[in-house]
């Protein structure tokens, strides 16, 4: 299914606090060592902890890795157990993140869903979804065209910006990403 998502730049960078990551280039304009980000999150409602999560991104001169995990905790586990892990790995070429692999496992109650995607040059080479997505007349079938020039959901959340000191510059926010998550293909457009 193809669909679109439009965010303002301010909303996109608000997502940075929840997992979207902006990484800066070196002053020379080339790919300089990027560094590592580790973030831990607690989800609360009226002071009651309902969940927790972690997000780790490690970006170097020529490769990157991102891992996220989360789970329900405390009172929320009484009503529904849930946990998940996602990971993406890829290459950095000419200041562009090129995903190579993506995996995701999400368990809610007794149901587990797994997604595995292998990519090369922005094209999906292989993917597997367990359990398979049931056919539906309301769902647009995935074609080969939907699997070209795409990012996985995690790699799409990484934004490379120039090291000019202004992460919220309008040009940094004008981005478009075609995303394939194993079940559907959708667009994410960021605007200032």
What are these regions (language model features)?
Residues 1-16:
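Bacterial N-terminal signal peptides that target proteins for export
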Residues 4, 25-29, 179:
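Amphipathic/hydrophobic helical signal segments and adjacent flexible N-terminal regions
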Residues 14-28:
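Hydrophobic h-region of N-terminal signal peptides that target proteins for export
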């Amino acid at each position: 299914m193809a669909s679109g998502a439009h965010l303002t730049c301010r909303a996109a960078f608000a997502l940075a606090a929840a997992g979207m990551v902006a990484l800066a280039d070196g002053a020379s304009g080339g790919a300089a060592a990027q560094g590592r980000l580790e973030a831990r999150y607690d989800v609360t409602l009226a002071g009651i902890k309902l969940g927790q999560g972690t997000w780790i991104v490690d970006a170097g001169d020529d490769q990157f890795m991102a891992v996220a995990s989360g789970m329900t905790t405390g009172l929320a586990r009484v009503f529904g157990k849930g946990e998940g892990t996602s990971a993406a790995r890829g290459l950095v070429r000419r200041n562009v993140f090129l995903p190579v692999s993506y995996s995701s496992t999400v368990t809610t109650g007794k149901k587990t869903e797994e997604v595995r995607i292998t990519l090369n040059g922005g094209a999906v080479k292989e993917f597997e979804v367990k359990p398979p997505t049931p056919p539906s007349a309301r769902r647009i079938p995935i074609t080969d065209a939907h699997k070209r020039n795409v990012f996985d959901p995690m790699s799409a959340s990484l934004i490379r910006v120039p090291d000019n000191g202004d992460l919220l510059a309008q040009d940094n926010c004008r981005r478009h990403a075609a995303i394939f998550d194993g079940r559907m293909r959708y667009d994410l457009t960021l605007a200032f």
